[in-house]
Design a protein with these regions (language model features):
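C-terminal peripheral helix-coil segments that are non-catalytic and often amphipathic
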Residues: 51, 55, 96, 100-107, ...
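Helix-turn-helix
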Residues: 1-17, 21
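Amphipathic alpha-helical linker/stalk segments
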Residues: 20-52, 60, 64, 103
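Membrane-interface starts of transmembrane alpha-helices
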Residues: 112, 116-120
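Short loop-to-helix capping motifs
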Residues: 14, 78-80
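Helical hydrophobic small-molecule/effector-binding pocket
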Residues: 47-74, 78, 124, 128-131, ...
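Amphipathic alpha-helical packing segments from all-alpha helical-bundle domains
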Residues: 47, 58, 67, 71-73, ...
Length: 165
C-alpha cells in the first residue's frame, strides 16, 4: 500500500526533506533526459551544444515538467534554504557542466573562451524566452522546427563569438 504520512516522514525527516528528495529524483531524470554528461568523443562541439538545448527544451515543455517547475517556484518562495539547494544542484550544476566543456575546448585551442562560466550563462540564455513562457503559462504552443532553427542559429552565433581572433 501507500505508506502513512508518519512512516514517509520517518524516512525523509519532514515535508521539506520529502520535497528535496523528489527534486533530487526529478533532477536525475532530467540529466538522463538531456544526457548532459556524455559528449561522445567524435561528436562535434556544435552538435553537442545543439543537442543539449534541444533536449532541455523538449524536457521543460512537457506538461508534467511545467507543473513541477511551477511547484518548485512556489515552494522556493517560502523556503530560502530549499531555493539555494535547488539552485546549487540544478541550474548551477548544469551550467558548470557546460562551462567545463567550454574550458576544455579553450584549452584544446578549439575556442577562444577565457571565461567559461560567463559563456555557459550566455549559452543557457538561448532558451530564456521559452523558460519564461513556460513559467508564465503564455504562448505554450511551441513549433518544434522554429525552436530547432532558433537553437541552431543561436549556437552558431555563440560559436562565432568564441572563435580565435
Amino acid at each position: 500500500g501507500g505508506g502513512s504520512k508518519a512512516s514517509i516522514y520517518k524516512y525523509f525527516g519532514n515535508k521539506e526533506g520529502l520535497f528535496k528528495a523528489i527534486c533530487d529524483y526529478r533532477r536525475e531524470q532530467f540529466y538522463k533526459d538531456i544526457s548532459l554528461a556524455c559528449m561522445s568523443e567524435p561528436e562535434e562541439l556544435r552538435s553537442y551544444l545543439i543537442r543539449i538545448l534541444s533536449n532541455f527544451l523538449k524536457h521543460i515543455i512537457q506538461p508534467k515538467n511545467i507543473a513541477f517547475i511551477r511547484l518548485v517556484l512556489n515552494q522556493t518562495q517560502k523556503d530560502s534554504t530549499l531555493a539555494l539547494y535547488i539552485h546549487e544542484n540544478g541550474a548551477k550544476m548544469i551550467q558548470m557542466t557546460i562551462a567545463k566543456v567550454l574550458a576544455k575546448a579553450h584549452e584544446d585551442g578549439d575556442l577562444n573562451c577565457p571565461h567559461p562560466n560567463n559563456s555557459a550563462m550566455l549559452y543557457f540564455g538561448i532558451l530564456r524566452d521559452y523558460e519564461w513562457r513556460i513559467i508564465l503559462g503564455v504562448d505554450l504552443v511551441i513549433n518544434e522546427q522554429e525552436a530547432i532553427n532558433h537553437i541552431e542559429y543561436c549556437v552558431d552565433r555563440f560559436l562565432d563569438g568564441h572563435q580565435k581572433p
